[in-house]
């Protein structure tokens, strides 16, 4: 779903200081070292946030034998029942496990996509803040963002909707389930961090404190 926003970056207008930059060395690769560092740095932010949401949503449940719930051969555990040595009701806990894990998967998918959409804003410039560029100044990105977000909402919030003339639910296409407003609040709060952290980096880089010979 990040395809349309990525394409929309191609119509980003040139920025005011582009002619003030020295030319790239002829032997400099694409991506260069700075590009590679940014890829790993922002990638680490998004991976960390995605894993955090997965475990906050209950994806890290364990079984009585201490193995992850993601191992399909295991059942989630009721700690009190395990401590007492009481055998759990398999069918009940299987149903709980499936529902809990699909919920975690849906939140993980959603936050990963939102990370990508918000990161498109970062990619408009490696040096300039999106606020100085104008958050909504690239109309193509705005439209692409809304279209991609609408598709995400379609597959998540209409997960229980049965496709006409079939018995197949939309959620079955991507193994999603409907999320609550609170879930979306967590997703947005975590995903927007990729913009906050990158804006802080740009502020530090552009700060006069770190300027060399008066250049920024």
Outline where the language-model segments fall.
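C-terminal transmembrane helices and immediately adjacent loops/tails
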Residues: 1-216
């Amino acid at each position: 779903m990040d395809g349309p926003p990525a394409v929309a970056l191609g119509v980003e207008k040139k920025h005011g200081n582009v002619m003030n930059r020295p030319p790239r060395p002829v032997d400099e690769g694409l991506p260069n070292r700075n590009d590679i560092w940014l890829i790993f740095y922002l990638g680490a932010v998004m991976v960390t946030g995605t894993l955090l949401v997965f475990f906050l949503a209950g994806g890290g449940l364990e079984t009585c034998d201490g193995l992850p719930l993601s191992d399909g051969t295991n059942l989630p555990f009721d700690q009190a029942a395990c401590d007492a040595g009481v055998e759990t009701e398999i069918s009940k806990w299987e149903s709980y496990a499936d529902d809990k894990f699909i919920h975690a998967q849906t939140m993980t998918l959603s936050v990963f996509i939102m990370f990508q959409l918000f990161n498109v804003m970062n990619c408009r410039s490696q040096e300039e803040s999106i606020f100085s560029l104008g958050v909504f100044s690239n109309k193509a990105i705005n439209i692409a963002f809304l279209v991609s977000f609408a598709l995400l909402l379609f597959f998540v919030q209409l997960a229980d909707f049965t496709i006409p003339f079939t018995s197949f639910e939309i959620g079955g296409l991507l193994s999603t389930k409907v999320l609550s407003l609170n879930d979306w609040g967590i997703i947005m709060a975590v995903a927007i961090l990729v913009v906050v952290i990158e804006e802080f980096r740009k502020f530090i880089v552009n700060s006069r404190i770190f300027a060399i010979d008066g250049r920024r």
